[in-house]
Design a protein with these regions (language model features):
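Conserved protein kinase catalytic core
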Residues: 3, 72-73, 119, 179-182
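Active-site-proximal helices and loops of the catalytic beta/alpha 8
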Residues: 67-172
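Short conserved micro-motifs at the rims of enzyme active sites and ligand-binding pockets
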Residues: 51, 122-123, 181-185
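Substrate-binding/active-site clefts of carbohydrate-active enzymes
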Residues: 1-59, 64-85, 97-103
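Generic secondary-structure boundary/loop-capping signal
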Residues: 18, 33-35, 121, 129, ...
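Loop/helix patches that line or flank the sugar-binding groove of alpha-linked glycan CAZymes
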Residues: 162-191
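Solvent-exposed, flexible loop/coil residues
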Residues: 11-12, 40, 136, 148-150, ...
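Short, solvent-exposed loop/turn segments at the edges of secondary structure
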Residues: 29-31, 58-60, 127, 131, ...
Length: 191
């Protein structure tokens, strides 16, 4: 990424230790590419300026932050359980970005692919952000004709999840999940 190459360790092929934009190594599991350091004012400025540009130049109606749980300064290493626990710093950083978005385009959506503890997701929902709700399993079961295992409650029903209203965006297909069409063809009882 060009922003990482501004402070680049060519020998180790990673950002330098003094980079104000990126960590040398990711602070969490499931990282893809380089991990931006959202605790620095430089990265916060860069992120907010990018959000502003996209809102004003392209008149988009909001953002979906992929792997939003990765916006953290805590070093979780490979501990997925610890990474998913309540993180007040992460909540406040995401809230700051959300407020920035709202200051430019009131009503714009902030959708988070978050998958953290329910308490953290509830707090983010109470602050006006929406959580990506995984309903892939249920949708695939329904598409395959297995009605008894296709309860959409958790992925779709914000009340069942204990979330504030309008804070869950369910999805039935994703680049991170098994292909629904393949499973329907190979295992479905509807064909």
């Amino acid at each position: 990424a060009p922003i990482c190459q501004l402070y680049w360790d060519a020998v180790n092929f990673r950002p330098t230790a003094n980079s104000p934009y990126a960590y040398q190594t990711a602070k969490h599991p499931f990282n893809v590419g380089y991990d931006l350091n959202h605790s620095t004012t430089q990265t916060q400025y860069y992120t907010k300026r990018t959000l502003k540009y996209l809102l004003e130049e392209y008149n988009i109606d909001g953002f979906r932050f992929d792997l939003s749980k990765g916006i953290t300064q805590n070093d979780y290493g490979t501990d997925v359980t610890a990474w998913g626990r309540y993180d007040a710093w992460r909540i406040n950083r995401l809230d700051d970005y959300h407020k920035h978005i709202q200051s430019i385009s009131p009503g714009a959506f902030t959708i988070l692919e978050h998958f953290a503890d329910v308490d953290e997701e509830k707090e983010l929902g109470n602050r006006g952000m929406m959580m990506w709700g995984n309903a892939v399993y249920q949708a695939t079961e329904a598409a395959m004709g297995f009605v008894n295992t296709s309860d959409f409650g958790w992925g779709v029903d914000y009340i069942k999840r204990g979330m504030p209203g309008n804070s869950v965006i369910a999805y039935a297909s994703s680049h991170d999940e098994e292909r629904m069409g393949y499973k329907c063809k190979m295992f479905g009882n509807a064909f």
